[in-house]
Amino acid sequence: MKTLETKKAPAAIGPYSQAKMTGNFLLASGQIPVDPATGEVAGDKIETQAEQSCKNVGAILEEAGLTFDNVIKTTCFLADMADFAAFNAVYEKYFTSKPARSCVAVKQL
């Protein structure tokens, strides 16, 4: 099993890794909308935050030699389901292969 870390995505803030890979199977930790260059949350709009989160996922995939087309399942957490359509507009630009997905609201995000 290989631990993956990249400076192109936010560093883990706890006792976990950005991702683990075994064979061709990658499990990535959840990605928040933090710009790894600044350590700051990317804006205050859902579109900007979704874009940054997707860029962070992309950086981890790249480190593993994978692309968004290799993703088979995602789990998305929104602070407010009213942002669902705006989030999807960004999400579908990255996840064009339409992986299986769960999306829920978590009020304390």
Predicted regions: what they are:
Residues 1-109:
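Short, polar/acidic, helix-capping and beta-turn segments at strand->helix junctions
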